[in-house]
Swiss-Prot record:
Any GO CC annotation of this UniProt entry: extracellular space
The organism's place on the tree of life at top rank: Eukaryota
Region of interest (Alpha-1), residue spans: 28-119
Expression across tissues: Ubiquitously expressed in neonatal and adult tissues.
Keyword Signal included in the entry's annotation: yes
Recorded topology in the membrane: Lipid-anchor; GPI-anchor
Primary localisation category: membrane
Organism: Rattus norvegicus
Sequence segments annotated as region (Connecting peptide): 340-348
Biological role stated in the UniProt entry: Binds to heparan sulfate proteoglycans on the surface of fibroblast cells.
Protein name stated in the entry: MHC class I-like protein MILL2
Glycan-bearing residues: N134, N234, N293
Compositionally skewed regions (Basic and acidic residues) per UniProt: 317-331
Upper taxonomic lineage: Eukaryota, Metazoa, Chordata, Craniata, Vertebrata
Signal sequence, start to end: 1-26
Amino acid sequence: MEASSGTAGPAVLLLILALLLTESQGSRSQGTHTLRYDVTACFLEGSEQTRLLVLIYVDDELFLRYNGDRRSAKPWACWIKGHGGDETCTREAENLPKEEERLREMMADMINQKGHDKGPYTLQATLDCELQRNGSTRGFWHLGYEGRNLLTFDQKTLTWTMDVPFTQQKKTFEPRAPKADLVKTFLDETCPARLQRHLASLSNVLPDTGSPVVIVTCRNYPVGRITLTCRAFNLSSRVATLLWLRDGKPVQQDVFGPGTILPSGDGTYQTWVSIRVLPGQEPQFACNLRHSNRTIMQTAVSGESMGWPSASWATRQEAEGPHRTHNDHVVDGGLVTGNANKDSPDASSCATASAISAFPVVVLSVALPRAN
């Protein structure tokens, strides 16, 4: 998308609507990378100006934020700032005015057709490409109106398809949609090339997170059950396996957790997994973390600390407050807060929580999953 002229007014209203028909991270295979643009344009009644906001994601994590009023993009992830982020932002800012102009024209046609009966109106565009492990690519381009999908580009037929509720408006919107050859070029070539460039940039800004930290806590219940919870912090990528072992063998029964690796917001990742056991069985269980070519084993109950969290993790805890309180079971990274999860552990209600950090740490070359 090349730069073009167009003027956006003062930032009076920026609306961020639900993402349009994007795939969840869990449906993507390991080694797949994605680049997605979520574009929202708002037209205010009685005004000829458009307010535009673009959120740019790499591997489903907010990467850059573009403000159409200022025609500028800013790095969103704090660990990107100061590491080539300005150059990346400038390049992205040069690419977006064309899409802004296209949405403005579509919106003007829509307003004229509806006769200015209400406002504000919003149009959305989602541009998404995937880079597979084997080097193949695929892409998605959706246009939406008022938070509902309006047009979807079919890469097989190279045509735009429209949802049933908007069939009567097809003559208004479809002529303003991007031409098929431009969409195909963007999804097949431009977007994957940008994604590869972003991944290359990110490979140079991986923060020194220190060692992974594994913490095991437990909680007693009056009914005679105990919940053991294993938490892993300071993960340098989403590629990690955390599981419970009983006498050295993996356990699946009575195990629960988020089932995914979650971002901590500082360039690191975290996750947790819990298991319900009977009193006295604790010594039979151990938590196993596999991450960055290392395996960390932590027993369920050791009665004493097995190591120290890394410096960066400890510093973050000191700045953000206690990781765990009686009423706020987990506040770091927002995994579980307050009493939302009745099975969330309270370290004070069972044996002393134990922690282990692995040394030496093996740091990956990028902060995102890389194909083997």
